Swiss-Prot record:
This is UPF0303 protein Smed_2872. InterPro entries: PduO/GlcC-like, PduO/GlcC-like_sf, YBR137W-like. Belongs to the UPF0303 family. It comes from Sinorhizobium medicae (strain WSM419) (Ensifer medicae).
């Protein structure tokens, strides 16, 4: 893994994986897509889609743990605060050899700079929420979200996915 390459690719993901519009039906389709992918691969995880106003999708699959919802909340809080993916935040901090507490005064109990939460962006509006996965290694959490977004938006996942 090359941090600079990953950060460039995540910036491309965040630029291309944006919606023309996003409503509750779109949230359902995204959530069901993520759940299908996770179930087919037998991935024990939690899936959450939350807009700034309310939670609009939640699913826990076999293998998820009681800690996963807290990880979802903390990663989602990071997206809501910084308007970029939690994985990009974590990699940027790793590159700077710091953390959220030291750099921004954000408590670990409330924020997590670990992969798996991705901003829901509506073109011309900005970030309106976050889609989050927790339960896998952080890179895999991030990759699953990106794959589902690419499928739903008709984007070329091969051009967007992180290098192995």
């Amino acid at each position: 893994m090359n941090i600079d390459n990953d950060l460039r690719r995540i910036a491309l993901q965040e630029q291309q994986l944006q919606f023309e519009r996003f409503d509750l039906d779109t949230a359902w389709k995204l959530g069901v897509t993520l759940r299908r992918m996770a179930a087919e691969r037998k991935l024990g995880c939690v899936i959450d889609i939350t807009l700034f106003s309310m939670q609009v999708f939640y699913a826990a699959l076999d293998g998820a743990t009681p800690d996963n919802p807290n990880w979802v909340r903390r990663k989602r809080n990071t997206v809501f605060r910084l308007f970029k993916s939690s994985y990009a935040t974590g990699l940027s901090l790793l590159k700077q050899q710091t953390n959220l507490q030291a750099k921004l005064g954000l408590a670990d109990a409330e924020f997590a700079a670990h992969g798996g939460s991705f901003p829901i962006v509506v073109k011309g509006t900005g970030c309106i929420g976050a889609v989050t996965v927790s339960g896998l290694p952080q890179r895999d959490d991030h990759n699953l979200v990106v794959e589902a977004l690419a499928e739903l938006l008709g984007a070329n996942h091969d051009e967007l996915k992180l290098e192995s």
